[in-house]
A protein has these predicted regions:
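Short hydrophobic alpha-helical segments enriched in small aliphatic residues
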Residues: 4-6
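Beta-propeller-forming repeat regions
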Residues: 40-298
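Bacterial N-terminal signal peptides that target proteins for export
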Residues: 11-26
Length: 298
């Protein structure tokens, strides 16, 4: 295969790097998006955290968002030192409920993710929670007896001002139960981890070192995409490696996280990565202003 230079904006962008010639393409497969897509501002949302997004749900929870801006952490990894103090959910009956954190932690995130993690037909709420002394953890909340309650949480990273960024939610190992993919410390040699909710706890399912799905200070968190890269019926994860000058396709098939392929980029990945409506094309904005369009090979 060889590189072919094309203009920006074409359906398939192939570019000439410094070294060898290789075509960048994605094998078409099933693409799983998050169960609730982001909305700029869901109808009826109040107390929305600045520069954050509400998400819509199709079940009992019709919308979820972060609010009650607080300044007690001061990390500023997402562009300012304002974080969320309360997690909100609006229900089908129009009622809005919330879970307010105590003074020892914040929601260091810009969007809530909705997904049914345990197969009970009801979405859980997935968000990054940061402790003022111990850094970040992935937290799962759920609707219990009409209230938002904490269900499970990964261990704190253990050091103040250490953060993690979610990368995807899908059944990455093919066992019929979704995993949550995160990159732990994406700015200092990130580790990709897969977690699954089981028995009321988040259980580690695999990890692989060497990824970065965020640029420090950026509000763009969506630097990943989920798709079936190797056409084996099990979805994989596409995300940048450390330095964000290449993309990796990681599989959890077989129970072990491993890299299937790497795709060099002509500049650092900026994001957000987006999929077309059919899940056939991934658009990858770069820091130099170019847009790399990655499509299935025909």
């Amino acid at each position: 295969m060889e590189y072919v230079d094309t203009k920006k904006g074409t359906n398939l962008l192939m570019f000439r790097p410094i070294r060898d010639f290789v075509r960048i393409c994605l094998f078409f497969g099933l693409v799983l998006a998050l169960p609730a897509g982001p909305a700029a501002a869901a109808e009826g949302v109040q107390d929305l955290l600045p520069d954050s997004r509400a998400v819509r749900g199709s079940g009992l929870i019709t919308a979820a968002w972060l609010g009650q801006p607080v300044r007690r952490y001061g990390h500023g990894v997402l562009g300012d030192r304002i974080e969320g103090g309360t997690l909100y959910a609006r229900l089908t009956n129009g009622r809005t409920i919330g879970h307010r954190l105590d003074s020892r932690s914040v929601f260091e995130d810009l969007t809530v993710r909705l997904a049914d993690l345990n197969g009970n037909g009801q979405d859980e709420l997935i968000v990054v929670q940061s402790n003022l002394e111990k850094g970040s953890a992935l937290a799962v909340f759920g609707l219990r007896a009409g209230r938002l309650q904490a269900i499970a949480r990964t261990p704190w990273i253990g050091t103040r001002n250490r953060w993690l960024n979610p990368a995807g939610i899908a059944d990455y190992n093919g066992d019929g139960v979704p995993e949550i993919a995160i990159v732990r410390t994406p700015h200092i040699g990130g580790t990709l981890q897969f977690w699954q909710l089981a028995g009321g706890e988040l259980v580690a399912k695999g990890e692989q070192y060497g990824f970065s799905n965020h640029r420090i200070g950026s509000r763009i968190q969506d630097l990943s995409a989920t798709l079936d890269w190797d056409s084996n019926g099990i979805v994989d994860l596409l995300l940048p490696e450390v330095g964000r000058r290449s993309l990796a396709i990681v599989t959890l098939s077989g129970g072990t996280a491993r890299v299937l392929a790497t795709l060099p980029m002509p500049a650092e990945v900026r994001g957000p990565l987006t999929l077309d409506a059919g899940g056939r094309t991934v658009r990858v904005p770069l820091e130099n202003g170019e847009m790399v369009t990655v499509s299935p090979e025909r």
